[in-house]
Curated annotation (Swiss-Prot):
One BP annotation, GO: innate immune response
Residues annotated as signal peptide: 1-22
Protein name (Swiss-Prot/TrEMBL): Hyphancin-3E
Propeptide: 23-26
Coarse class of the protein's main subcellular location: secreted
One annotated Gene Ontology cellular component of this protein: extracellular region
Organism: Hyphantria cunea (Fall webworm moth)
Family that this chain belongs to: Belongs to the cecropin family.
Amino acid sequence: MNFSRILFFVFTCFVALASVSGAPEPRWKFFKKIERVGQNVRDGLIKAGPAIQVLGAAKALGK
């Protein structure tokens, strides 16, 4: 009897979760913000690349 109740409960939870469609997205998109920060860091390194190379060459000449 208890097993059938547990099975029924699990089945109803599964049906309830499977029938949900189009849940609204959360307003605070944490992973999107992290992704944007990573893109900004990458873009900054790309823009600063030539300056870093010049500094590396100058440091090598100074040795």
